[in-house]
């Protein structure tokens, strides 16, 4: 289950780094960051463990006591609408711990919500409402995890850079993918309005690249990866600095464009090779990201609960100084600025490369026509 979170970020970061490095090209200065004034932020800890493991973890008295003391919530993934998952939610309801229904698809449908399975989403939510009513469950909010399907990640992971490039180019040209993305946006927008109508507080969990796509005024990532910029709910950008360890600079850059921020990852996956490359955040990195995220929003998601417990983060938060200042080094700001510049260029190229190819072909044809016309003219003059 842990690899479900690790693979998307690892592979997508590889996609965007395919044509660009991470060297800095701008001149920045160190930045000091504090949390925004007012009430302390609410943390929501994501838990995507199996039912048995989640039940054991969330039955621990010290975990429940810490969550209640700190007024923090849980986002529990709901891959199946069964009695086991319902029992966990009922326990959290009894303890007055806010629970977010982290909605996902069954694994056979790709696990994440996206353009490819959008037609199944309304039925999935209808089943959720039936399940909720059956077990009398209470929800603080309901979240849609919108990411590319797991099958896409497996294909991209095993195919190598050349196969990845071919697939990306093919999808960027596909009118079918374009129409699918447009239809999916309407479906998810309508679904979010349905959630609101039925009294839920909807959220969407989006990859951080969604902010770059918006800035470029493009829909190319929707077409290539199937992600959908659904509107109407609280959008949380998943800004996981554990995949590049540039510190809070990543959160600082994307936080300006986020209504809510999810930070992580505090836990590794089942794949040791990925763990070596994308190690979990340590306490210093985690606490710096927390302060930086709190500079922009009162709602902060944390992936994952199990990782925080393994590293004793939850307990340490009881004495955490939310008024501390975090220094973001200029070097880290430079790296993130360059990374986002590369991402922006790639989005632009992927959006318009076919037009550039057509222009180049036309220029070649024009050059050949001029060359041929001059050659014919010279022959006539000689004759």
Can you annotate each of these PLM segments?
Residues 116-146, 226-229, 292:
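An active-site-proximal structural segment forming one wall of the substrate-binding cleft
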Residues 72, 76, 219-250:
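Aromatic- and acid-rich polysaccharide-binding/catalytic face
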Residues 128-176, 301:
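Active-site groove signature of glycoside hydrolases
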């Amino acid at each position: 289950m842990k690899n479900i979170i690790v693979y998307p970020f690892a592979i997508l970061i590889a996609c965007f780094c395919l044509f660009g490095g991470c060297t800095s090209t701008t001149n920045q200065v160190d930045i000091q960051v504090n949390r925004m004034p007012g009430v302390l932020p609410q943390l929501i800890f994501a838990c995507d463990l199996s039912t048995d493991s989640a039940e054991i973890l969330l039955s621990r008295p010290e975990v429940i006591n810490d969550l209640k003391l700190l007024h923090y919530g849980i986002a529990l993934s709901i891959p199946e609408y069964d009695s086991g998952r319902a029992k966990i939610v009922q326990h959290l309801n009894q303890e007055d711990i806010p629970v977010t229904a982290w909605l996902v698809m069954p694994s056979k449908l790709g696990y994440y919500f996206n353009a490819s399975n959008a037609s199944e989403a309304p039925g999935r939510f209808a089943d959720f409402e039936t399940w909720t009513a059956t077990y009398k469950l209470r929800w603080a909010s309901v979240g849609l995890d919108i990411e590319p399907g797991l099958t896409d990640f497996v294909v991209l992971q095993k195919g190598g850079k050349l196969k990845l490039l071919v697939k990306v180019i093919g999808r960027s040209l596909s009118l079918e993918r374009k129409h699918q993305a447009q239809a999916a946006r309407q479906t998810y927008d309508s679904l979010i309005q349905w959630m609101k109508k039925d009294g839920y507080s909807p959220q969407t969990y989006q990859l951080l690249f969604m902010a770059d796509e918006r800035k470029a005024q493009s829909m190319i990532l929707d077409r290539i990866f199937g992600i959908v910029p659904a509107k109407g709910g609280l959008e949380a950008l998943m800004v996981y600095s554990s995949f590049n360890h540039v510190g809070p600079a990543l959160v600082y850059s994307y936080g300006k464009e986020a209504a809510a921020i999810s930070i992580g990852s505090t836990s590794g996956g089942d794949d040791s090779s990925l763990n070596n490359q994308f190690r979990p955040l340590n306490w210093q990195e985690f606490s710096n990201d927390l302060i930086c995220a709190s500079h922009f929003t009162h709602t902060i998601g944390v992936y994952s609960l199990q990782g925080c417990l393994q590293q004793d983060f939850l307990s340490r938060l009881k004495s955490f100084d939310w008024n501390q200042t975090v220094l973001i080094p200029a070097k880290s700001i430079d790296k993130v600025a360059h990374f986002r510049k590369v991402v922006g260029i790639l989005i632009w190229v992927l959006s318009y490369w076919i037009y550039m190819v057509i222009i180049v072909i036309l220029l070649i044809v024009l050059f050949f026509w001029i060359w041929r016309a001059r050659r014919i003219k010279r022959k006539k003059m000689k004759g």
